[in-house]
């Protein structure tokens, strides 16, 4: 019911994740990222706590592959979970429990990991990784969106997807991008549209938080200042 891609930009250190599902509000439950730490997915029959546990372990110094193995070994009902993680060093890990639904697969490259369940084709995660790797100089958000779209083209889920989301962290303590389409007939297309609106404004919103006196105007009716 879900396919996801988590990645790290080797040039900027940004980390992020995209995810799509036939279930509503998938990003609210499955996508996790933390600045300077990494990104993780807890999916299939989801326990959102596991994404937090993965990032806590990575922050404490555990490489992503070992963090995934430790959480999978210790978590109750781990056989129902599918987990992935990428850390700030580009180490990746993936796990699919024996009760992962339907056709399922994972794929890993240095700096990126993809996984899916109830897939229409085994090649979906590999297609996502290939698209993410195609332009290493591009913004991580563009690369993540390319990966998500490639996963859909490769078959995506067995059924139609209905939600999607993107989460990206940079140097700040908050996500610099947190976009969600919680229910739509074409959620990946809508997420792409949101990204194209958000991308040129994202840096300005960081400036408004850190140094509002130099931030650009909102350029909306009634805004006479910053």
Task: Tell what function each PLM region has.
Residues 1-226:
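N-terminal nucleophile
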